[in-house]
């Protein structure tokens, strides 16, 4: 009610200006008529101001609520998006029929360059389905009765899905007969269950961790039963395919020198360092780096341990001789590059199981980390200057 008070003050200040007060004092008879008119006019203005202020407040309260989007509104937005995409493709000289979302993002970044750090604050042009949240259709009729019998559970889609899955489990347990003692195991390699966020997006409902875990347990129980094609298709709705990483490691072939000694060569990289390693099948554990013993080349103990770790992991200490050449980078990066090169060369003298153990231990995986560049206006890559008020 602060706004009406300010407005009332303005009205009263206009009525009691010095000129008005002087005229009223000269003509006392005019005071009565003026007072009646002033009361009537002022009451009207005050009531009007108060009424207007209350209505504005109510409108602001309603505007702050979550907005609901109808199907007609979404269709209109999609039509406008398609028209805008066609215009944007013509501006960029591209074919509108093959103008994908990646092309739209690239065109927007080119036409509207922005230096804002927050990407969500930059200009964008996305499909309405990605901007406006999904909403359910009307869940009750004109008489106010809900359509679904599980409406008052608060999670009708989730409990309806659980009801369907449990019905399939009961039906399969009823008809499997003599197969009750044996549980079928299916190969699910190459796919995964939906995560909780994906399931919530599918059901358009918020789920707890217990609800999600119970749903996954019920689906896993369904998979242990002898399922038909219909059940298999039903379960696949809640699985997503994943890219299978090849477990086969490229192994360098064994070579032989003039004396008939078997050896293997390989390369490794770490940051800007590049290393080549030659690992001999038999030896006494000598390691030379650029013609120098590794104890002299690497004075830091941590770098020496990096070089010895592949042999220590395979229990092959003092069984191989190694000759390495390395260039670029610092001592830590060179040690990492040599370790990767030696681990790859060792694969030629070990079994497939040992190669798999090395892969799982990370010995055959290159380290992609590099030094992060310094940012302008900062002391370093992440560190900021000390803030001073003046």
From Swiss-Prot:
Region annotation (Disordered) ranges: 368-390
Any GO molecular function: structural constituent of ribosome
Record PROSITE patterns: RIBOSOMAL_S9
Compartments reported by the entry: Mitochondrion
Pfam families linked to this entry: Ribosomal_S9
InterPro entries cross-referenced by the UniProt entry: Ribosomal_Su5_D2-typ_SF, Ribosomal_uS9, Ribosomal_uS9_bac/plastid, Ribosomal_uS9_CS, Ribsml_uS5_D2-typ_fold_subgr
GO cellular component labels: mitochondrial inner membrane; mitochondrial small ribosomal subunit; mitochondrion; nucleolus
Domain of life of the organism encoding this protein: Eukaryota
Leader sequence residues: none
GO biological process per UniProt: mitochondrial translation
Keywords associated with the record: Mitochondrion, Ribonucleoprotein, Ribosomal protein, Transit peptide
Subunit structure and binding partners: Component of the mitochondrial ribosome small subunit (28S) which comprises a 12S rRNA and about 30 distinct proteins.
PANTHER family: RIBOSOMAL PROTEIN S9, SMALL RIBOSOMAL SUBUNIT PROTEIN US9M
Recorded family membership: Belongs to the universal ribosomal protein uS9 family.
Protein name (database record): Small ribosomal subunit protein uS9m
Native source organism of the sequence: Mus musculus
Upper lineage: Eukaryota, Metazoa, Chordata, Craniata, Vertebrata
């Amino acid at each position: 009610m602060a706004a009406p008070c300010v407005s009332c003050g303005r009205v009263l200040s206009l009525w009691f200006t010095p000129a008005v007060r002087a005229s009223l004092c000269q003509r006392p008879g005019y005071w009565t008529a003026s007072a009646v008119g002033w009361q009537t006019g002022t009451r009207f203005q005050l009531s009007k101001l108060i009424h207007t202020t209350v209505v504005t407040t109510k409108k602001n309260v309603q505007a702050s609520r979550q907005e609901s989007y109808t199907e007609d509104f979404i269709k209109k937005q999609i039509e406008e998006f398609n028209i805008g995409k066609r215009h944007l493709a013509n501006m960029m000289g591209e074919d509108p029929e093959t103008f994908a979302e990646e092309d739209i993002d690239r065109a927007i970044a080119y036409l509207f360059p922005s230096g804002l750090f927050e990407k969500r604050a930059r200009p964008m042009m996305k499909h309405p389905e990605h901007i406006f949240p999904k909403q359910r259709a009307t869940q009750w009729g004109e008489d106010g009765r809900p359509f679904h019998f599980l409406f008052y559970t608060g999670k009708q889609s989730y409990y309806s899905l659980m009801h369907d899955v449990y019905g399939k489990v009961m039906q399969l347990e009823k008809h499997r007969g003599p197969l009750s003692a044996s549980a079928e195991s299916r190969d699910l390699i190459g796919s995964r269950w939906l995560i909780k966020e994906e399931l919530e997006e599918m059901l358009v409902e918020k789920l707890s961790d217990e609800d999600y875990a119970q749903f996954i347990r019920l689906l896993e129980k369904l998979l242990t039963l002898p399922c038909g094609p219909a059940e298999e298709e039903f379960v696949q709705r809640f699985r997503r395919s994943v890219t299978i990483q090849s477990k086969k490691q490229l192994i360098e072939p064994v070579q032989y020198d003039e004396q008939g000694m078997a050896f293997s060569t390989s390369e490794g990289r770490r940051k800007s360092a590049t290393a080549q390693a030659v690992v001999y099948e038999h030896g006494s554990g000598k390691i030379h780096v650029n013609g120098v013993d590794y104890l002299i080349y690497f004075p830091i103990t941590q770098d020496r341990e990096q070089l010895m770790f592949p042999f220590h992991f395979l229990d092959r200490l003092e069984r191989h001789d190694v000759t390495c050449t390395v260039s670029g980078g610092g001592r830590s990066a060179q040690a990492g590059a040599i370790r990767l090169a030696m681990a790859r060369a060792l694969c030629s003298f070990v079994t497939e199981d040992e190669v798999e153990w090395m892969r799982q231990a990370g010995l055959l995986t290159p380290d992609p980390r590099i030094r992060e560049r310094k940012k302008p206006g900062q002391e370093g890559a992440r560190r900021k200057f000390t803030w001073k008020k003046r």
